[in-house]
């Protein structure tokens, strides 16, 4: 069990790093959004275009990263949605059993299906052709837009981190069940 707990701790450490990156993305999203708003209105007033599609797309890329990088962090800290009016009154062992069953049956299934469904579109976005070779990657349809492949790849990272954190939570729940 000690080896599994060390493995769980390593996953938790990585999750903390991704959680901090998610928080940083929030700050960048706000800063870029603020710039986009000011530049748009100032540009209208002066008759000069100060914004670009790149900055607008970067803003929604960062907004997406906030959630994709933060999913595992939310699970680790127990901020995920629950039926709290029941859950709060239960003993730690009962909570651990409910989480163990829920994570094992539903969250792992959700992550595996998510990884399976998104892998092919991500590879296509990187330019993978039907014959297995690679061509040009997917670009924004807007002029001066950003490539789509990097942000689509982060979907896989988000699901992967959520799956790894789920395993970590299962290990910790088993420990709670064994101790009580």
Regions found by a protein language model. Name each.
Residues 1-180:
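Alpha-helical transmembrane segments and membrane-interface helix-loop junctions
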């Amino acid at each position: 069990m000690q080896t599994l707990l060390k493995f769980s701790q390593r996953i938790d450490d990585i999750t903390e790093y991704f959680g901090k990156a998610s928080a940083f993305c929030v700050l960048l999203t706000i800063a870029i959004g603020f710039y986009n708003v000011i530049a748009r209105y100032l540009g209208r007033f002066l008759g000069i275009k100060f914004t670009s599609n790149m900055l607008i797309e970067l803003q929604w890329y960062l907004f997406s990263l906030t959630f994709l990088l933060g999913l595992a962090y939310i699970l680790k800290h127990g901020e995920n949605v629950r039926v709290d009016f029941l859950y709060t009154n239960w003993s730690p062992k009962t909570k651990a059993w409910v989480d163990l069953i829920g994570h094992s049956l539903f969250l792992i299934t959700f992550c595996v299906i998510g990884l399976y469904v998104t892998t092919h579109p991500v590879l296509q976005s990187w330019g993978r052709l039907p014959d297995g070779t690679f061509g040009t990657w997917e670009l924004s349809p807007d002029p001066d837009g950003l490539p789509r492949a990097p942000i689509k790849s982060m979907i896989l990272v988000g699901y992967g981190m959520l799956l790894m954190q789920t395993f970590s939570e299962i290990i910790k729940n088993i420990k709670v069940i064994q101790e009580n």
